[in-house]
Amino acid sequence: MLTKRIIPCLDIKEGRVVKGTNFVELRDAGDPVELSKIYNEQGADELVFLDITASFEKRDIIIDVVKRTAEQVFIPLTVGGGIKTVDDFRKILRAGADKISINTSAVKTPDLIKEASEIFGTQCVVVAMDVKRKYITDSQDENLKNKNIFETKLGSCWFEVYIYGGREGTGIDAIEWAKKVEYLGAGEILLTSMDADGTKDGYDLVLTKAISENTKLPIIASGGCGNANHVVDAFTEGKADAALMASILHYRECTVNDLKKEVEKNNIPVRF
């Protein structure tokens, strides 16, 4: 089994780290550069830095914060938010990022995945997917014909891809989109459950497992981490390659090292 990764996530709004629940009710969690330094020292494998309002507000990503973070951090840094072109990729990589995460722009312009992977390499291109369960009320609905249906404790559902920071549904089935981004040249998928986001009730394991089993790409599970057992579940039941978390680290409920120790106890390889 390959070494599993623990990745703190820094959601940035107006230059500050914020955290919310189900993509709303945002509250301040600190300075991105200072938090990055802390997680670097705690043994994080990577960091994900997302400017969560950039795509929606049509605002360029904050290059200055990326530069200052990259100067302090010596682990891989993935940066996303408002990145629409190959030139945007180039600017962020020059600022110090190792990988670029795209979501809205990938859906709107799928060729960007192909173009960026050809220029910068597949390892640079992370496709972020914000996904929400769509419960089925009418099994005869014509719109369900091309959807992958899953049974959950709360009923049958399919998984819909959302864009603009979770504000707009696309009607796209998450399983089919994952297959397409793999075909187009993405190197990794950052998979966020909008239903689980910020709840601390655990990752959406049905979703994570479904995407993991339908693509060969590494999957970063995101949304819902409340304790170390949730991370273990993401790796075992969800078959994820990495686990992303925010609240439990930002509010000092545990450290990266605490999480890794618990994961290792379950015979899952991690890097210390």
Curated annotation (Swiss-Prot):
It catalyses: 5-[(5-phospho-1-deoxy-D-ribulos-1-ylimino)methylamino]-1-(5-phospho-beta-D-ribosyl)imidazole-4-carboxamide + L-glutamine = D-erythro-1-(imidazol-4-yl)glycerol 3-phosphate + 5-amino-1-(5-phospho-beta-D-ribosyl)imidazole-4-carboxamide + L-glutamate + H(+). GO terms for biological process: L-histidine biosynthetic process. The keyword Amino-acid biosynthesis applies. Its EC number is 4.3.2.10. Pfam families: His_biosynth. GO terms for molecular function: imidazoleglycerol-phosphate synthase activity; lyase activity. It is found in: Cytoplasm. Keywords: Amino-acid biosynthesis, Cytoplasm, Histidine biosynthesis, Lyase. GO terms for cellular component: cytoplasm. The active site is at residues 11, 130. Pathway: Amino-acid biosynthesis; L-histidine biosynthesis; L-histidine from 5-phospho-alpha-D-ribose 1-diphosphate: step 5/9. It is an enzyme of class 4 (lyase). IGPS catalyzes the conversion of PRFAR and glutamine to IGP, AICAR and glutamate. The HisF subunit catalyzes the cyclization activity that produces IGP and AICAR from PRFAR using the ammonia provided by the HisH subunit. Belongs to the HisA/HisF family. Heterodimer of HisH and HisF. This is Imidazole glycerol phosphate synthase subunit HisF.
